[in-house]
Structure formats: C-alpha cells, structure tokens
Amino acid sequence: MDILKSLGHPEELFNLFKFKMGGCSTVMPKLDYESMSDSLRTCYLYLNQTSRSFAAVIQALDGELRHAVCIFYLVLRALDTVEDDMTIPLDKKVPMLNNFHTFLYQDKWCFTESQEKDRQVLEDFPTISLEFRNLAQEYRDVISDICQRMGVGMAEFLEKKVGSMKEWDLYCHYVAGLVGIGLSQLFSASQLEEPEVGRDTELANSMGLFLQKTNIIRDYLEDTQVGRAFWPQEAWSQFAVRLEDLAKPDKLESALSCLNLLVTDALRHVPDVIAYLSRLRNQSVFNFCAIPQVMAISTLSKCYNNPMVFQGVVKIRKGQAVTLMMEATNMRAVHTIISQHSQEILQKVSLTDPSRDKTLDILALIREKSALSQSTLPSRTHHLSPMYLSAAMLLAALSWQYLSTTAAQAQGPGNIQGQ
C-alpha cells in the first residue's frame, strides 16, 4: 500500500492525502473531453493508456500546445513501438523506421502485426495521423522532422550494439535528445516561450539524455532479461565478460562499479538541465519540463550504489513522486530538490569506487550551479509535534483507504483520466 511506504515521511503522507483530494488541480487540471472531437478524445485516451506519468504533465499544458504535444508523444510512441517489437523482422522494420514520418500524411496507413503492449497506437494510427494533420503547420513541421530523424537513428542502432560512451550519447540523442529538441521547438512555436528555447539544441538535447540515461540505468534487469542491451559496452566490459553477468551475486562489487560509472555519466547533464529550466517563463511549460527531471534525479539517487538495480525494480515511492510533482513548480524548489538528491548521492560515494573522483567533481559542479542561500529557500520539511503527527498520520491512513475504496467503486470503464 502506497501510504505504508511513506509512513516515515510525514510530508509525503500529507501530499498523498492532498493529491487524493484533488490538491494537484493546478499541476494536473482536468480536461474538458466533451468539447473535443471523437478523434482527439481517442488520442487522449491512448495517451493515458500508454503513459500515465507523461499524460499528467502533457494534459496540464496551456492552450493549443497541449494538443500538439499530445500528438507528438503518440507519433513517437508509435515509432518506438515499432523499434521495440522483437517479432518484426529487420528487413521489414528498418524501412518502416526510415519511412515512418511519411505515414503521417497517409490517412489510411496502420500496422496490425505488432505484439507490443502499446500496439493500439499502430493499429489505430489513422486517428493519430488525422489529428496530426489538423495541427497548425508550424507544429506539423517540427513533429515530422523529429520523427524522420529519430526513425533513421533507431534504424541505425538496430543493426549494431551501443559500444562506446559516445555511441551511448548518440543513441540517447536519437531516442530522447531529439524529443527534447522537438518539444523545445514546439514551446517556441506556441509563443509561450522565447525563440531562444527552441534554438538552443544543446541544452534541449541534454534534457532528453538525462531522462533516457536514467531509464536505461534503472531498467538494466528488465532489458537484459528480454535480450535488450542499452548499457554501453565500453562501460560494462571493464567489469564483466557479458552484460548479463553483472546480475550474478558473485559480480556484485563489479556491477556496482559499473552502475556508479553510468550514474556519474548521467549526472553530467544536470548543469544543462538547470540552465534550461532557468530560461522557461510559462508556468505550465515549466511544470511539464521540471517534474520529469526531478523525478529522474530522485531515481538516480536511489539507483546509485544500489544492488537492487541488478535484482529487481528500483522505484521511488508514490508519496515521494507526488511530493516532487507538487513542489517542483519554481526554480528555487528545483534547486533545493537537486541539491538534496546530490547530497544523498555524495553520502553514498565509496572510497574504493573507481569513478569516485569523477563523481565528486560532477556533484561539486551541480552543487555550485544550484547553490542558493539556504535562508532564502522555502523549507521542504514539515515540523510537526508528535501528537499532531500521530493524529495526522492516522487520519491520512484512514482517509486514503476510504478514498481509494470509493474511487475504485465509482470509476467506470470509460474513465479516460486514470490515476
């Protein structure tokens, strides 16, 4: 139960209860689905089905940008589904990836042979492509361009492994950096952000690389169990003969050294993340960008030097995720969150870790970039008396159980919003 995992964190209990009571309406407002066309409503249904985390922040964007980003996400989700489907032979998959951007202008194109869990975005691609063609030209140009470049990059890496650290950067650029670049161009096209945001592709690329590397690091076990290899060979070959050997109990010390090396590499993007977020002016765009980034550094902090990466699933608590989502709405709070998780990593750096010096250097740079006078920062700690805390925890636990039960009873099959 989510609330039990947060019992030692009173601020998480408070935020879980607040979240259940609708306290996140400013971050995740409900949409008016009744005013949408059937095809657009279906697109938001697919968005919620394929990614609840991204769906939440996408649906909170302002104005027409919301629809553009929704369609952008679904187009790339469809492309990614083709890449991930191991049942599609290469001689069929490579041309599909290279030509996928052309399907946006083919009103009847669909693919019904996928075995992936998100195959509905391929089977009903005509609905998605219809809404793509309904977008303003400036949005269509960005989405089509990024789709084309990403498809070519995915096809390139289908036939080769991620070898060097530079190739890891290149792969992550194709599958995530381009997403950051495309989103930034959409922000500027909407005029919610300045043209500079869309022009600075280096910072936008770093935003995507930080998220993608975090996911790749966290998903080591899941990926290797199905034959996928995204950890760069240049890194893991220093510690094992085969990538999957890192999961062996007798390889734990080597596995942690490799893990820490990759976490350190991912952390080098954090200064760019700080610089990028500092430029944003629209509140909905800031929330959209900041929330995944603080989730990522929280996840990296939990992954660093953690044997569970090689034994199971490493996730942050739901209460922690809700707290981050509710707090990461301004730059001061983001600085604080980044500083706190950087400090958590610092406390876990071993004297014998091979990457120790590099880790300490990048953590020092991150602390420098996010340094603010502690006296001017909003407190993230709730100082509660023992009696009040006990009563609040009991009330929150009972209320959470009641609300979860009633919500489950009331929720119908057509509820598009999800949890």
Regions from the PLM with identified roles:
Residues 336-378:
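Long, charge-rich low-complexity segments
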Residues 212-216, 299-305:
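Transmembrane alpha-helical segments that form the membrane-embedded catalytic/substrate-channel core
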Residues 315, 375-386:
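Interfacial loop-to-transmembrane junctions
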